Amino acid sequence: MKKALLIGINDYPEGNELTGCIEDINSVKAAIERHGDGSPNFGVKMMPNVQTSGEVMDAIRKLFAGNDDTALFYFSGHGYMNSTGAEIVMPQDIATPGQYYTGIQMSTIMSIVNTSKVRNKIIILDCCHS
């Protein structure tokens, strides 16, 4: 089985909105959900404007659980590299005063991916510092 998790976030608070991230996940879904002959390809879960880091992490854990053939994680939204060089993806809930650059460190995501029994793992980040 092939599974995909597509996260696109346009709506960030405090003037940090983006445009096109929801359109991006719609385009990716259209490209991977079915083969050219119309037969099923990827089972797709879309999470537009997901609110919290917890929701994102739960979805990532679920995507890479089990022993499926392929798992694809696509993120379109804000990304950041902190002062230690850690790469971070940024759900909506990180845009609160004093916590803007906390987000989800890629090392946290990669620890889930690297211990997964999924055979083929694909990660696509469409954000700054990806």
Role assignments for model-derived ranges:
Residues 1-88:
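Boundary/activation segment at the start of structured domains
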Residues 53-130:
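Caspase-like (clan CD) cysteine peptidase catalytic core
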